[in-house]
Amino acid sequence: AEYWNHNSAYHPWILRQITGHSGLAALDVGCGEGLLLQRLSPYCTTLVGIDPDPSSIARARRRLPQATLLTQLFDDLPTDQSFDLITMVASLHHMELEPTLHRVRQLLRPGGQFLVVGLSARKSVADWVISALSVPVASIGSALHREARDIGVQVAQPRESLAEIRTAAAKILPGARIRRGVYYRYLLSYQRPA
C-alpha cells in the first residue's frame, strides 16, 4: 500500500535524480517494506533491498517478488557486488558514518549515484533554530498528506550534526552535495566519477 511520511515525501526527489536512466542496478539500504524500490523499478533491471528487520523484508517480498530482498546489515553486504544507484532513506544515521561512506564508494560503479534522505542531530544554535522554523511546514505537510506515523520500522536518534556529515562527506565523497530539506531532513547526492 502507498503511504506518506517525512521520508517518502522525498521519493520524488530521488526519482528526479535518475530520470532518463534505465537498466540500473539499484541497492536500497534500509529498504523497509520496499515502497522506494517499487517506485525505482521502472528504471532498474536489478533491485536489491536490505534491512535488518525480518518483518519489514517479509512485507517487501510481498510488494516486490522480483527483487532480491535480504535481512542483513549494510556492513555484511559482499563487496564483490556493484551498483549504479545506492539509496538510503532515514537509514544512514543507524550506521557508523565514515565506514559506511567508504563502503558506499567501494560498491558504487563509475558514474553511479548515492542518494540520501537523512536525519542529523541538532547540536548548534543554527540547527535548533532551523528545526523550530520547520515545525509549521512539517505540521501542515503531515496534515495535508495524512501522514502515516508508524509504519512498523525501527527508529534511532541521529548522532552527527549536519556540519559533521558535511565534513565526512567532503573527505570521503568529494563533490557530494548536501542541502537541508523540510520535514527535518537533509538531502545528500553524490556521483562517483566515471
Residue locations for each model-derived region?
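A conserved beta-strand element that flanks and buttresses the S-adenosyl-L-methionine
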Residues: 87
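Conserved alpha-helix/loop element of class I SAM-dependent methyltransferases that forms part
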Residues: 6-24
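Conserved beta-strand/loop positions that form the S-adenosyl-L-methionine
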Residues: 29
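Conserved beta-strand signature within the Rossmann-like core of class I S-adenosyl-L-methionine
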Residues: 111-118
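Class I SAM-dependent methyltransferase SAM/SAH-binding core
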Residues: 33-35, 39-76
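C-terminal alpha-helical "lid/dimerization" subdomain adjacent to the S-adenosyl-L-methionine
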Residues: 120-168
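A short, conserved alpha-helix within the catalytic core of class I
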Residues: 95-104
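Conserved Class I S-adenosyl-L-methionine
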Residues: 155-191
